């Protein structure tokens, strides 16, 4: 059983998608947040999942908060740490502790547009496709090995909000499948590439 801790900062719609997918061999040990008011905490608690908030305002400095979050996550001894709308950059020591065990979903087709404001940046650059990326987390922001990507068209009439809504629908499909592949032992990392045993026979040929 793949014991999983999910980190969120807001409503956690991707977390909800993972929970509702009822993924085989996955047990969600906890949903944690840096925001005590995160709506996703109440939703997870309503599903009978253990929740906790680690509020950075309760700590004198960022290093102390980071240590508290690391210790809280480690206390659950997870096989997988899932970032589902967690809006803080993980410190290097966290990335080292849970190397090859931490997965993030990012709202762009990496390596394009790491960081914030991805949808507006895609529009501003004239992209005809946008999307999302599920990847393993490393200390270098949004640069870890890519597990899966999903794309949507960018329309001339799009705003950042309309594009974000279209991408989010793909996120809700892509992340549960990637988590299921992790839990099934389908994923292996070779340098910057992730090989997926489930899709190994796909060649792209008709």
Q: Model segments located where?
A:
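Donor/substrate-binding cores of folate-linked one-carbon enzymes
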Residues: 21, 34, 84-196
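Short beta->alpha connector loops at strand-helix junctions that form conserved
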Residues: 52-57, 105
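Short, basic/aromatic-enriched C-terminal tail that caps enzymatic domains
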Residues: 16, 189-206
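Glycine/small-residue-rich loop that forms an oxyanion/phosphate-binding "nest" at active or ligand-binding sites
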Residues: 53, 60-78, 87
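Short, structured coil segments at secondary-structure junctions
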Residues: 47-48, 98
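Conserved beta-strand segments of alpha/beta enzyme cores
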Residues: 27-30, 50-52, 101
């Amino acid at each position: 059983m793949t014991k999983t801790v999910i980190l969120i900062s807001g409503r956690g719609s991707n977390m909800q998608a993972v929970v509702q997918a009822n993924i085989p061999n996955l047990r969600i040990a906890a949903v944690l947040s840096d925001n005590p008011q995160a709506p996703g905490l109440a939703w997870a608690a309503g599903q009978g999942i253990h929740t906790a908030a680690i509020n950075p305002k309760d700590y004198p400095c960022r290093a102390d908060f980071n240590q508290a979050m690391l210790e809280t996550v480690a206390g659950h001894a997870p096989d997988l740490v899932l970032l589902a709308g967690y809006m803080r950059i993980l410190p290097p020591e966290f990335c080292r502790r849970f190397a090859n065990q931490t997965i993030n979903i990012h709202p762009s087709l990496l390596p394009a547009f790491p960081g914030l404001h991805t949808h507006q940046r895609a529009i501003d650059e004239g992209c005809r496709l946008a999307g999302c990326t599920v990847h393993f987390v490393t200390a270098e922001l949004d640069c870890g090995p890519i597990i899966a990507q999903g794309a949507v068209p960018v329309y001339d009439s799009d705003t950042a909000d309309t594009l974000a809504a279209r991408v989010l629908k793909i996120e809700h499909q892509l992340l549960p499948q990637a988590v299921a592949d992790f839990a099934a032992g389908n994923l292996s990392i070779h340098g910057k590439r992730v090989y997926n045993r489930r899709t190994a026979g796909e060649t792209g040929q008709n």
